[in-house]
């Protein structure tokens, strides 16, 4: 379920929307479509992680999470993964429970992988399909 967090205005509203979505049966909650700013931010994602954690403690049901929009670099993605591990634990470090909704991120991940192999960065155009 997409919450469009940029429209919710407060962390309390975000927490409530997350809880309502999970209680209504959502098996995955997503920050936004990525079209409305702000989209995924660290504080917004933490509020959602904490709501998921508390829901799991209460019900035993694992809910997935997808931060979308605004995550552009591999370094930013790593920060989200660390926060996920620290808040929800290893069980959520799987595509069944956590995914990035960030198309721009893919190019940076590819550039980082090429740099590891070739010791040189490539432009995003290097990865474009013909």
Q: What are the language-model segments listed below?
A:
Residues 2-66, 72-100, 111-130:
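Alpha/beta enzyme core
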Residues 103-107:
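Short, flexible loop segments at boundaries between secondary-structure elements
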């Amino acid at each position: 379920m997409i919450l469009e967090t940029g429209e919710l205005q407060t962390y309390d509203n975000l927490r409530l929307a997350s809880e309502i979505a999970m209680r209504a049966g959502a098996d995955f909650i997503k920050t936004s479509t990525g079209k409305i700013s702000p989209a995924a931010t660290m504080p917004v994602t933490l509020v959602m992680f904490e709501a998921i954690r508390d829901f799991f403690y209460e019900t035993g049901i694992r809910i997935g999470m997808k931060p979308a929009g605004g995550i552009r670099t591999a370094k930013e993605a790593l920060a989200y993964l660390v926060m996920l591990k620290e808040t929800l634990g290893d069980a959520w470090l799987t595509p069944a429970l956590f995914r990035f909704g960030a198309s721009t991120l893919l190019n940076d991940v590819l550039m980082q992988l090429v740099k590891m192999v070739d010791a040189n960065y490539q432009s995003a155009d290097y990865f474009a399909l013909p």
